[in-house]
Amino acid sequence: MGEPIGRVTRCSTQGFVGAVRQLDPETPTFGTLCKAEAQGGNIYVVGAVYDISIEDDPFARHVASSERANSEQIADHVVNRQTPIEISAIAVGYIKDEKYFFSLPPQPPLTMAEIIPLTDAEIIAFTAGFEFIPTLINFRNDELTAAVLRAAAQCRPESEQHYYLQGGGRACARLLNEDFVRLETLIQRIKP
């Protein structure tokens, strides 16, 4: 299991929002697949990160607006202060008894549940059949759909990545067969 990247602060069956101590260059990123425990550990809700926001605070505004913010003030704010960073994730499925389900979870995670990025092996298993795509298509954030597909492709051996993206494009085409403009834009975004 991966290292936690934050804790749930708000949640519903549609998704969850979590607080993150600080941004790591690798996670969380837009499109990261992560999970949070629900039902007392009986299930894990799988979410796709669709927003990362860094809230300001009065001290940050004060330092940023000063004519000469010295490096010590900036370092103190970046390293020592609790910068309010939030990630928002849409629920794209859940894990129960090591099986993947591609519907909304029966219950949301509880507040303070750890948010853990899926491992490469979990991402490969969860994204293998493209069953998660309808939820993303219905969320109407094509950038997110493309980001999740590209990230899932990157977890696979290099020789499989192109074929995986083609399969993802076909799955999107079946769902968007009456919206060619949106489909064409999405296909362009899927390209690595």
Describe the predicted segments one by one:
Residues 4-9, 32, 43-54:
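Short beta-strand-centered aromatic/proline hotspots
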Residues 80-192:
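Charge/polar-rich, low-complexity and marginally structured segments
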